[in-house]
């Protein structure tokens, strides 16, 4: 059972508050000891075992605690000012139901404020509520329900019980509290703590309202109710947690320094995130970073932290191996100790004389070096007398040396004015305030002794190991560390930020580490040569005792052809080994003694000027020729041979190299002579490979493909894609060890990841698929949907927190697709256009393409630059935020574009139904009155069948067989003469004259006579001639009559033919005119079609350009991977394979610089393109609103003409518009008048047209007319068309360019602005020339289609030319007939006709007169009969019958 001891020291009351209370009690902790207990439960629980720390914060204090007894009133409240924190407690001793009262705590801030409202429901699970919201909270509340309605955008809206476990018995042990900071709020409620991070401003004013506490006293004692502890300053408590016992006490001595400098190591050796890193520095072997962030390997993994209370006179020895960690503060790690850090934790200046007298470094080989400093120039005899290594601020300059046996080996330099940290690495590096002060051989142990000091400051000793971390540095000191030890922390490291905003981030490539080596070579018979190089070093001392390497040191090569100066490789393989000896001398150059102590040295061969390192020769480097020489004659490069001592490296000789690049000679680590296939493959795992001379890191997998040619296969960027095993022909693929992915981070946690392969990553196990990628998430997709199917937006109902393009991720990790906003309908007002003055129009459909969005691009900068090489990644961190800037620029650009595109697009269901050509041409959606037409919206050719003439069923025609079997004689007949003649004759030729017909009173006979008729009339004629002399000429009368009748027929037929000719000529000429006009319209239609096809071709060309632009940019970016940017190779792995680390770093740095430049160029191009697309997106939006949803008034905005209507359709990355416009085909040229200037005596005034859509012009008849600008329709102007102006003067303002902004505020001289930018921001560096190449991505290739459209357009144009020629030919075929003379003959009627007419008149007239005058009731006969009847008989009355109704229909 854990024990708890509380040692309290009562602090005197130093402040107080004036409370508007009827009774006020100010007391110390008293019965409120549970406050400290609660505090310990919240804070000591996070401490590791074996901890001894001082905690400082705005904690509750021992005193004062206030008890305020107020009257039962709602309108009063207590106000506290300048607070940092507030704690309160509810005591339950002697409390009845009447004592349970409400409390409303309000902390005012901007824009957020805090309220904690407590009700009287002490036993309820939701008896209180905390609200952190925007707004102004009330000081009091009467609400019975707990809500946060007073504010908006609440950061915290949480209900909690007043008493733990909802039991009143636990209330007395409960602590409530609030702390507020500029970036966070901490709340202590019902035994739990909440920390909410956000930016806010706090006034420090707290109000306590609704304290309707009772004034009752129990047994004469004031009842404890609500108790308050206002906190104004930081309080410190010391917590010691050892062996399961926690001891807490007030900290009274150096509390602030202890909090700032001593921490408890967290499990895993991590330093707490809230540690201040006071006097901790970034260790560096080169220049010191002043301020910034970088990812680096630093000794920040603490194996043991040993706090030393104060300086004590003592001597200590600390070793890197086998260190005893018995005084550690926190957990202990058993990792290898890399660096021991001595940190002086002080806040005030510590004078010199308080520190170590000397630091002794026990190096390998048993040599002990000492480091000490002196305040003036010293002699050799006094080096060991009064030297020191002071901590803190020195009172003067200190000159430091490396000593050996009291002799100075090397002068190190001047000690910094203030020594705050000393760090010593086991690799022999000695750091002061982070700077590498000295380097020597590896160190085993450190010994030091401390001087006695009167200061009571303390210091710490930290045994640390190297780890990768994101380090923030300010003024050369570490201020914050983020360990790169988890998935989310790796992203933080890659983004160079400790706090990740919600968004998508590229997943950093994991470090490969030590992997197996795969080698693929061609099978061959190998011969092997071992090259042994012996280097004999000569060492001696200088006048001050420092070791000096002699330039007489000897290099011995194997003998070849009786020559030891040059050695060439003559075998297929070779291995090079170096053997080093060391001899010394006293003063001369005779080196016979063994090197001991500080004279001990080792020979090393450095890279020098060669593009490969000496120690990499046996790492499968290949050559066509390779020779080593001691002479520079004919050499390509050289190695530097150096003597490495305990203090420095000294170059003594040079080893020259003669080489040619190729594959004939291979450097190998061991002898492999004979017939061998030396290939070694490690399949299906990450391996470091050398495949036919190409090196890298990747996963090798066997494939089923068969390729006939080639040994290895690369991409355009030079990356190895696969290779062939020549022995069996098997093809192997090579893929990267790590595949780039995008992690979705919300509230600092990875909730999902987008990847191109179906493999678990980032610890995410739940996954789903989309058409373009796999998505892994913390969200567990239900079993209702089959895993691996395409996700549907309705699967998850949640609000996305982050979006990228058209996808979003919710807080629970679920992936949703963002739907476009739907609208209820379209409004399409009609308006006129602003055009010139045409007289005729033609309809044209014009195509226009506008880009609306670009495809989002995400680039893993470190992957592109380094391709996963761990050493390159370390170098890349030196470029600070270069990658972060590139990635964030692309991500922010994509998010901004997604937001704009999402807010732009709306979908109308009604408009969607008409969004296809079929629906637009269909009459189903039209009113019934229009459905009789086949196609309203289009011009389909099948509609012509309805206007073609139909067959006449009344006409009778013979069949084709009848036309073949019968001979036909076709003549022209007169009316019904021929038909009547045939009926009369009945087929008898003798009845020819009897059946003669009359046409217009003239006797006629059909003009055709058969053989029988000709015989009959010939006989009649012959008989008449023969008998004529005898008086028988009358026989020829039938012949004469028949001939004359037939001549009459011909004459009348000629007249009819003449009339028919006139009708025919008129009709033919009219037909020719119609044909000419029709062909003219066809010609015009084909011409317009040609122009339409040209616009379609241009639009498609623009679509192709838009789609391929990004691919070209990516191709451009990919091609840069082939450029070496003046490095020895474009392959980073190959560079590190050939060179030592330092030389390779210099070469790789060139690649990093070049590739970052290429990335910056790509990002600049992308952002520029996005800016252009943003403008075109607004243009598309304007065109949708003005062209599609309404009718444009602007000429040329919706097509080149007067706009009628437009259709929009989706196109790759944009929208394509089909504008239907009226194109003027004929114009009327007029002289427009701006107005009329009139004189009235001495007064001059002007008249201008009121309507700006009208044009005033003066015609040839000197009259003024007005016409609309849309079409030439002149009319006479009236007075109502004009308005009067004051004068006729026209004023012009003469201004310079500098005056234009004062006249036109938004005027910008673009040319001058660009010129200023170029002058002021001219780069002072040279950007490498980047050439374009083909990118292996999908391209939209419409070149063939565009060429076909252009060819068809040209062919149609040629057709129009041919039609114009045909029209001219048709015009030349107009008929001009020669009219026949028409003779009119009048024939008088015979005498007997007139006789008959006279007889009829004589007979009929008397008869008619008699009938009219003598008959009837009033006639003469009628009157006579009536008189006779009346005389002979009496009068009788007629009998009448009843009248009946008569219906007339």
From Swiss-Prot:
SUPFAM superfamilies: Coronavirus S2 glycoprotein. Residues 29-1390 are virion surface. It is a single-pass type I membrane protein. Residues 1104-1148, 1338-1380 form a coiled coil. Residues 1022-1043 are annotated as: Fusion peptide. The keyword Iron does not apply. Keywords: Coiled coil, Glycoprotein, Host membrane, Host-virus interaction, Membrane, Signal, Transmembrane, Transmembrane helix, Viral attachment to host cell, Viral envelope protein, Virion, Virulence, Virus entry into host cell. Residues 1411-1449 are intravirion. One of its GO terms (cellular component) is virion membrane. The chain crosses the membrane at residues 1391-1410. It is found in: Virion membrane; Host endoplasmic reticulum-Golgi intermediate compartment membrane. Residues 777-1449 are annotated as: S2. Homotrimer. During virus morphogenesis, found in a complex with M and HE proteins. Interacts with host ANPEP. S1 region attaches the virion to the cell membrane by interacting with host ANPEP/aminopeptidase N, initiating the infection. Binding to the receptor probably induces conformational changes in the S glycoprotein unmasking the fusion peptide of S2 region and activating membranes fusion. S2 region belongs to the class I viral fusion protein. Under the current model, the protein has at least 3 conformational states: pre-fusion native state, pre-hairpin intermediate state, and post-fusion hairpin state. Belongs to the alphacoronaviruses spike protein family. The KxHxx motif seems to function as an ER retrieval signal. This is Spike glycoprotein.
């Amino acid at each position: 059972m854990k024990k708890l001891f509380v040692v309290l020291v009562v602090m005197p009351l130093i402040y107080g508050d004036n409370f508007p209370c009827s009774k006020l009690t100010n007391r110390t902790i008293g019965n409120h000891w549970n406050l400290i207990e609660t505090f310990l439960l919240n804070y000591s629980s996070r401490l590791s075992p074996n901890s001894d720390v001082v905690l400082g914060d705005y904690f509750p204090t021992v005193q004062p605690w206030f008890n305020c007894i107020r009257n039962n009133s709602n309108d009063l409240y207590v106000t506290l000012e300048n607070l940092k924190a507030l704690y309160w407690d509810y005591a339950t001793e002697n409390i009845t139901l009447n004592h349970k009262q409400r409390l409303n705590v309000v902390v005012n801030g901007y824009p957020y404020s805090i309220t904690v409202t407590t009700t009287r429901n002490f036993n309820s699970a939701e008896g209180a509520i905390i609200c952190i919201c925007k707004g102004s909270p009330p000081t009091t509340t009467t609400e019975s329900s707990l809500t946060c309605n007073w504010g908006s955008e609440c950061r915290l809206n949480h209900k909690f019980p007043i008493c733990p476990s909802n039991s009143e018995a636990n209330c007395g042990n409960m602590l409530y509290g609030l702390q507020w900071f500029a970036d966070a709020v901490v709340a202590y409620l019902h035994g739990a703590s909440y920390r909410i991070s956000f930016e806010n401003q706090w006034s420090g004013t707290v109000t306590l309202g609704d304290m309707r506490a009772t004034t009752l006293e129990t047994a004469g004692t004031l009842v404890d109710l609500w108790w308050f502890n206002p906190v104004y300053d930081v309080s410190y408590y010391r917590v010691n947690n050892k062996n399961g016992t926690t001891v807490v006490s007030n900290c009274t001595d150096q509390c602030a320094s202890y909090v700032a400098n001593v921490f408890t190591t967290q499990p895993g050796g991590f330093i707490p995130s809230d540690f201040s890193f006071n006097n901790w520095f970034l260790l560096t072997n080169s220049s010191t970073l002043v301020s910034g962030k970088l990812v680096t390997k630093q000794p920040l993994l603490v194996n043991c932290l040993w706090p030393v209370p104060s300086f004590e006179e003592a001597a200590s020895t600390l070793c890197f191996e086998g260190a005893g960690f018995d005084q550690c503060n926190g957990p202990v790690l058993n990792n290898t100790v890399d660096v021991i850090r001595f940190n002086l934790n002080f806040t005030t200046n510590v004078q010199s004389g308080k520190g170590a007298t000397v630091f002794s470094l026990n190096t390998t080989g048993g040599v002990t070096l000492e480091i000490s400093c002196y305040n003036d120039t010293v002699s050799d005899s006094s080096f060991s007398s009064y030297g020191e290594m002071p901590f803190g601020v020195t009172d003067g300059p200190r000159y430091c040396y490396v000593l050996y046996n009291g002799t100075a080996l090397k002068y190190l330099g001047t000690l910094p004015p203030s020594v705050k940290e000393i760090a010593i690495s086991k690799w022999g590096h000695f750091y002061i305030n982070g700077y590498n002060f000295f380097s020597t051989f590896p160190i085993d142990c450190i010994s030091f002794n401390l001087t006695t000091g009167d200061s009571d400051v303390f210091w710490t000793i930290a045994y640390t190991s190297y780890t990768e971390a994101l380090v923030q540095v300010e003024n050369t000191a570490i201020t914050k560390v983020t360990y790169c030890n988890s998935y989310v922390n790796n992203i933080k490291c890659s983004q160079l930020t400790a706090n990740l905003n919600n968004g998508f981030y590229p997943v950093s490539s994991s470090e490969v580490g030590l992997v197996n080596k795969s080698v693929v070579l061609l099978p061959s018979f190998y011969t092997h040569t071992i090259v042994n190089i012996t280097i004999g070093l000569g060492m001696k001392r200088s006048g001050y005792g420092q070791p000096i390497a002699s330039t007489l040191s000897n290099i011995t090569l194997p003998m070849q052809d009786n020559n030891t100066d040059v050695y060439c490789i003559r075998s297929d393989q070779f291995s090079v080994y170096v053997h080093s000896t060391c001899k010394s001398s006293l003063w001369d150059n005779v080196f016979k003694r063994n090197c001991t102590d500080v004279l001990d040295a080792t020979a090393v061969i450095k890279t020098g000027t060669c593009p490969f390192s000496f120690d990499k020769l046996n790492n499968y480097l290949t050559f066509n020729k390779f020779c080593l020489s001691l002479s520079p004659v004919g050499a390509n490069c050289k190695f530097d041979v150096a003597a490495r001592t305990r203090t420095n490296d000294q170059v003594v000789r040079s080893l020259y190299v003669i080489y040619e690049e190729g594959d004939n000679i291979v450097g190998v680590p061991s002898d492999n002579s004979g017939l061998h296939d030396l290939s070694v493959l490690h399949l299906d795992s990450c391996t470091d490979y050398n495949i036919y001379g190409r090196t890298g890191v990747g996963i090798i997998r066997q494939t089923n493909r068969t390729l006939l040619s080639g040994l290895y296969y690369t991409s355009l960027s030079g990356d190895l894609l696969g290779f062939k095993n020549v022995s069996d022909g098997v093809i192997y693929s090579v893929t990267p060890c790590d595949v780039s992915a995008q992690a979705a981070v919300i509230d600092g946690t990875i909730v999902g990841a987008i990847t191109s392969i179906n493999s678990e990553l980032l610890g995410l196990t739940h996954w789903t698929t989309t058409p373009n990628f796999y998505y892994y998430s913390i969200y567990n997709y239900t079993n209702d949907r089959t895993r691996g199917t395409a996700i549907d937006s309705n699967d998850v109902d949640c609000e996305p927190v982050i979006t990228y393009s058209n996808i979003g991720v919710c807080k629970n990790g679920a992936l949703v697709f963002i739907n476009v906003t739907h609208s209820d309908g379209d409004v399409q007002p009609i308006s006129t256009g602003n055009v010139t003055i045409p007289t005729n129009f033609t309809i044209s459909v014009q195509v226009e393409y506008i880009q609306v969005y670009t495809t989002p691009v995400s680039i893993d900068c470190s992957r592109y630059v380094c391709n996963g090489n761990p050493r390159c990644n370390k170098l890349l961190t030196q470029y600070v935020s270069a990658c972060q800037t590139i990635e964030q620029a692309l991500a922010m650009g994509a998010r901004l574009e997604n937001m704009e595109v999402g807010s732009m697009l709306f979908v109308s269901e009604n408009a969607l139904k008409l969004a296809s050509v079929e629906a637009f041409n269909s009459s189903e959606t039209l009113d019934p009155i229009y459905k009789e037409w086949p196609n309203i919206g289009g011009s389909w050719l099948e509609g012509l069948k309805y206007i073609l003439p139909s067959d006449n069923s009344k006409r009778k025609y013979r069949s084709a067989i009848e036309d073949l079997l019968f001979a036909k004689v076709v003549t022209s007949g007169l009316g019904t003469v021929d038909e009547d003649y045939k009926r009369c004759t009945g087929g008898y030729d003798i009845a020819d004259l009897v059946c003669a017909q009359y046409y217009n009173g003239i006797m006629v006979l059909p003009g055709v006579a058969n053989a029988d008729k000709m015989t009959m009339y010939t006989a009649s004629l012959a008989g008449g001639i023969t008998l004529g002399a005898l008086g028988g000429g009358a026989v020829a009368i039938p012949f004469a009559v028949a001939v004359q009748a037939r001549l009459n027929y011909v004459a009348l037929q000629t007249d009819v033919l003449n009339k028919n000719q006139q009708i025919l000529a008129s009709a033919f000429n009219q037909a020719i005119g119609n044909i000419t006009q029709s062909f003219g319209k066809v010609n015009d239609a084909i011409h317009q079609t040609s122009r339409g096809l040209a616009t379609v071709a241009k639009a498609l060309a623009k679509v192709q350009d838009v789609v391929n632009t990004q691919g070209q940019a990516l191709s451009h970016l990919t091609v840069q991977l082939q450029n070496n940017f003046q490095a020895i190779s474009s392959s980073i792995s190959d560079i590190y394979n050939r060179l030592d680390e330092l030389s390779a770093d210099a070469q790789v740095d060139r690649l990093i610089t070049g590739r970052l430049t290429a990335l910056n160029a790509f990002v600049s191009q992308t952002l520029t393109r996005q800016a252009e697309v943003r403008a075109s997106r607004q243009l598309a939006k304007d065109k949708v609103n003005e062209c599609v949803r309404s009718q444009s008034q602007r000429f040329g905005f919706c097509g080149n003409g007067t706009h009628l209507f437009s259709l929009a359709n989706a196109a790759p990355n944009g929208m394509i518009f089909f504008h239907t416009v009226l194109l003027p085909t004929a114009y009327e040229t007029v002289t427009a008048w701006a107005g009329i200037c009139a004189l009235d005596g001495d007064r001059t005034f002007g008249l201008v047209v009121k309507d700006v859509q009208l044009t005033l012009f003066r015609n040839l008849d000197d009259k003024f007319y007005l016409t609309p600008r849309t079409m030439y329709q002149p009319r006479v102007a009236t007075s109502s068309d004009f308005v009067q102006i004051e004068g006729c003067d026209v004023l012009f303002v003469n201004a310079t360019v500098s005056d234009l902004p004062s006249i036109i505020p938004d005027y910008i001289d673009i040319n001058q602005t660009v010129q200023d930018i170029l002058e002021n921001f001219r780069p002072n560096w040279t950007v490498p020339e980047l050439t374009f190449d083909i990118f292996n991505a999908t391209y939209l290739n419409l070149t063939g289609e565009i060429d076909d459209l252009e060819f068809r357009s040209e062919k149609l144009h040629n057709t129009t030319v041919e039609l114009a020629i045909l029209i001219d030919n048709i015009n030349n075929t107009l008929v001009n007939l020669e009219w026949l003379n028409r003779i009119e003959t009048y024939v008088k009627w015979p005498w007997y006709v007139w006789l008959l007419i006279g007889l009829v008149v004589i007979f009929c007239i008397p008869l008619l007169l008699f009938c009219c005058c003598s008959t009837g009731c009033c006639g003469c006969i009628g009157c006579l009969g009536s008189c006779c009847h009346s005389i002979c008989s009496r009068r009788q009355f007629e009998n009448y019958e009843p009248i009946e109704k008569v219906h007339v229909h």
